[in-house]
């Protein structure tokens, strides 16, 4: 059976998350349903990142095995046809070897978190960005965020329901920048804990609005205590933007 790697974009708002769940719509279920209509038999789709309810993706990666040997353009276009009207799109499809696994072969995952600091309600970006009603100091947030680089016990920024065996992770890159009224955080790591990015963002916003200093933020990280985390940022502003794999880009 040929194996295909697909790159996927989706609006996370209508979904309970990536992972298939009983009695709740998921991105995985939408893709598997569409792939089954193409292949004529049940198809399992494996994703690189199990995004939470409401979290978006610009370039989620998944793989699937089909009984039919189809061109990559046919796979992309046919799955997109059967996905309608769900807000999910296959941007690209490629043939890969049988040992490729979207989740376990990944070497790095990249996330973006979008914030807008304004008093007025959102209209065009509603559900796609976090509106913070106080002015954010993006430079202070960036400075504080550098404490997260490298290997740490991220218990403070780990959801209480996280099932990972260890809270220790290595963060490869993190940056906070302002673009007009929008503040964007980007970060990269091999893997993340459950709600780690949203927890880090929520605590950095405490720095951005002047409630915490960079030292307060570092102390919260070092405490390795979930109760020291600031408010968890909403899912609205979070996007999985890319997944890296070994070999040529």
Swiss-Prot record:
Amino-acid positions noted as binding substrate in the UniProt annotation, renumbered to this chain: 111
GO biological process entries: tRNA pseudouridine synthesis
Keywords (A to Z) from UniProt: Isomerase, tRNA processing
A Pfam family it matches: PseudoU_synth_1
Matches recorded under SUPFAM superfamilies: Pseudouridine synthase
EC number: 5.4.99.12
Molecular functions per Gene Ontology: RNA binding; tRNA pseudouridine(38-40) synthase activity
Residues forming the catalytic site: 52 (nucleophile)
Keyword tRNA processing attributed: yes
UniProt catalytic activity: uridine(38/39/40) in tRNA = pseudouridine(38/39/40) in tRNA
Function (record text): Formation of pseudouridine at positions 38, 39 and 40 in the anticodon stem and loop of transfer RNAs.
Subunit structure: Homodimer.
Similarity comment text for this entry: Belongs to the tRNA pseudouridine synthase TruA family.
Protein name per the record: tRNA pseudouridine synthase A
């Amino acid at each position: 059976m040929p194996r295909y790697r697909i790159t996927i974009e989706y609006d996370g708002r209508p979904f309970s998350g990536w992972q298939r769940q009983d009695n709740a719509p998921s991105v995985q279920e939408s893709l598997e349903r569409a792939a089954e209509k193409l292949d004529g038999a049940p198809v399992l789709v494996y994703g690189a990142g199990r995004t939470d309810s409401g979290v978006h993706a610009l370039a989620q990666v998944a793989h699937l095995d089909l009984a039919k040997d189809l061109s990559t353009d046919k796979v992309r276009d046919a799955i997109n046809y059967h996905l309608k009207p769900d807000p999910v799109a296959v941007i690209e499809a490629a043939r890969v070897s049988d040992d490729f696994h979207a989740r376990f072969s990944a070497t790095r995952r990249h996330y973006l978190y979008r914030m807008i600091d304004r008093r007025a309600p959102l209209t065009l970006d509603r559900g796609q960005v976090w509106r913070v009603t106080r002015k954010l100091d993006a430079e202070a947030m960036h400075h504080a965020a550098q404490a997260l680089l490298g290997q740490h016990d991220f218990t403070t920024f780990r959801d209480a329901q996280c099932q990972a065996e260890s809270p220790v992770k290595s963060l490869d890159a993190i940056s906070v920048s302002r673009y007009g009224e929008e503040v964007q955080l980007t970060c990269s790591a091999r893997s993340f804990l459950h709600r780690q990015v949203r927890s880090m963002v929520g605590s950095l916003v405490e720095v951005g609005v002047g409630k915490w200093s960079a030292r307060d933020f570092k102390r919260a990280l070092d405490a390795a205590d979930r109760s020291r985390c600031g408010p968890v940022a909403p899912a609205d502003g979070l996007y999985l933007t890319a997944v890296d794999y070994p070999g040529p880009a």
